[in-house]
Each structure stands twice: as structure tokens, then as C-alpha cells.
Amino acid sequence: MRNKFLNEIVTKPTELGNKIKLMIRPPEIKVEEIEEDENTLSKTHQILKLKAIEGLKFDKTSLEAEAGKPIALIISNPDLLQHNFVLGNPDSMLKLGSAADSIITNPKAIEMNYVPEIDEIIASSKLLDPGTLEIIKLKPLKKGKYPYVCTFPGHWRIMQGYLTVK
């Protein structure tokens, strides 16, 4: 019986690979519901949505908004890891990244949600556990290209993008 099983492994590697993938793939994480009605929010704010996804990525590397109008940014985390969201002033990507790299040395980094205390930060989320979300309401922004990153240690180099305000 054992030899027959081993023979199947050798002769049908694709099937076995699929079986293994199914066995180790975690169940999908459902994101909590939004407490605030999105239709009501859209009457006063531009709605932008962003997800933290598998592979240390945001689902979008670029977002667009209209200058002079308030923004409601809905950040959700269906990933298995914790993530945050930090929005910086135009031309601040490298400074955000440098601050993200150095925050790990701060003994209060976890309490700070891994959000550095620098002037370039316009807005940030809390540290989002898997299956959670946060709505960040922004005052109207001027035209520009605003960088956003996840500042959880080691994430910012891959997990980044730009909000372009036109």
C-alpha cells in the first residue's frame, strides 16, 4: 500500500501539489462591516478604498482624488498579517521610509501602531489586525502626489503607493 501511494506522488505531482496547496492555504479572512453607512458618507466625502493584501502589498499602488473636497479613505485588512496606513506630504516617501525603518528601535513602537512621529505625516491608521478596517477622514487636500505606505517593520519598501490629488 505504501509503495502505491509513493508511486502516485511521483506519477501525479500536479495533483499532489494542488492538494498540498489546499491543505496549507488558510481560510479567507472576512473584513468587518463598516459602521458608518457608505451612502451617507459619500454625500460629504469622496470615497476611496484600499486593501492590504497577501504578499505585503496594497491592492492599489495609486489612488486619485479631487482637490478641494473631503476624502473618506476606507482601509481594510483581509490579509493574515497586521498592517497600517500612513499618508505623507508630497515628496516625503524616502523620509517616511527612513522613519519606518528606525521606529523599530523605539520601545513604544507597538503602542504607536508603528507610526513614526514626523511632521511629514498627514494621516495614519491604527495597526489593523486581520479582518479589520478603519475609515480615515481627510480634510480637502491641495493638488499633488501624496505617498502612502505601511510602516509596520519591513513592509514599506514593497507596500506603498501614491494618492494623486488633481
Q: What feature does the model see in each segment?
A:
Residues 2-38, 43-44:
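Pro/Ala/Gly-rich low-complexity, hydrophilic intrinsically disordered segments
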Residues 22-38, 81, 110-112, 119-166:
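Extracellular/periplasmic metallocenter environments
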Residues 41-70:
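N-terminal edge beta-strand
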Residues 50-52, 65, 87, 138-140, ...:
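Hydrophobic residues in beta-strands and at strand termini
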Residues 73, 85, 150:
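Divalent metal-coordination and catalytic microenvironments
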Residues 75-77:
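Asparagine-centered strand-capping/turn motif at beta-strand->loop junctions
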Residues 82-88:
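Short, hydrophobic/aromatic beta-strand segments
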Residues 88-118:
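The feature marks short-to-medium sequence segments in extracytoplasmic or secretory-pathway proteins
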